[in-house]
Curated annotation (Swiss-Prot):
UniProtKB keywords: Hydrogen ion transport, Ion transport, Membrane, Transmembrane, Transmembrane helix, Transport, Vacuole
Known function: Proton-conducting pore forming subunit of the membrane integral V0 complex of vacuolar ATPase. V-ATPase is responsible for acidifying a variety of intracellular compartments in eukaryotic cells.
Family listed: Belongs to the V-ATPase proteolipid subunit family.
Organism: Nicotiana tabacum (Common tobacco)
Cytoplasmic side: 34-55, 118-129
Transmembrane segments annotated in the record for this chain: 11-33, 56-76, 96-117, 130-155
Highest classification ranks of the organism: Eukaryota, Viridiplantae, Streptophyta, Embryophyta, Tracheophyta
Membrane topology value: Multi-pass membrane protein
Protein name: V-type proton ATPase 16 kDa proteolipid subunit
Site (Essential for proton translocation): 142
Location relative to the cell: Vacuole membrane
Gene Ontology CC annotations of this record: membrane; proton-transporting V-type ATPase, V0 domain; vacuolar membrane
Length: 165
C-alpha cells in the first residue's frame, strides 16, 4: 500500500524522540535535585525542626525543572501533525535538538540544585546567615534550566520553516 506521507518517513521518530528527551532528562534532573536536597532537609530537620519549612525551597525549585520539560514536550508533540502529511527531517531534527537542549539543561540544573540544596540547608541549620547565599546560588542554578527552556522554544519554533509556503 503506497504511503500518502510526503515528508521523510523517519522524521516523526526524531520529533517524538525530542519530546521524550525533554521530559525524561528534565524529570531526571528534578528527581535528583528533589532527592538530594530532600535528604539534606531531613537530616537538618532532626537538629532544627523549626527550619524545615524554610528549607523546603531547594526541593520546590528542583520540582519546577520537570515542568520545563513538560512544556517543551507538549510544544514539540503539537508540532508533529500527521494530518499535514509534510513533516521533514529538518523539522524532526529541530524538535530533537529542542528536546535535548531543554532536557539536558534541566538535568544539569537539577544536579546543581540538589548538591547546593543539600549542603545549603545543612549549613543554614548551623549558620542562618547563609540562607540568602544559598538562595542566590539556587537561583543561578535554576537559570541554567531556564536557558535550556528558552533555547528549546526557539529551536522548536524553527520546525516547519523548511516548507515552502
Amino acid at each position: 500500500m503506497p504511503s500518502t506521507f510526503s515528508g521523510d518517513e523517519t522524521a516523526p521518530f526524531f520529533g517524538f524522540l525530542g519530546a521524550a528527551a525533554a521530559l525524561v532528562f528534565s524529570c531526571m534532573g528534578a528527581a535528583y535535585g528533589t532527592a538530594k536536597s530532600g535528604v539534606g532537609v531531613a537530616s537538618m530537620g532532626v537538629m532544627r525542626p523549626e527550619l524545615v519549612m524554610k528549607s523546603i525551597v531547594p526541593v520546590v525549585m528542583a520540582g519546577v525543572l520537570g515542568i520545563y520539560g513538560l512544556i517543551i514536550a507538549v510544544i514539540i508533540s503539537t508540532g508533529i501533525n500527521p494530518k499535514t502529511k509534510s513533516y521533514y527531517l529538518f523539522d524532526g531534527y529541530a524538535h530533537l535538538s529542542s528536546g535535548l537542549a531543554c532536557g539536558l539543561a534541566g538535568l544539569s540544573a537539577g544536579m546543581a540544585i540538589g548538591i547546593v540544596g543539600d549542603a545549603g540547608v545543612r549549613a543554614n541549620a548551623q549558620q542562618p546567615k547563609l540562607f540568602v547565599g544559598m538562595i542566590l546560588i539556587l537561583i543561578f542554578a535554576e537559570a541554567l534550566a531556564l536557558y535550556g527552556l528558552i533555547v528549546g522554544i526557539i529551536l522548536s519554533s524553527r520546525a516547519g520553516q523548511s516548507r515552502a509556503e
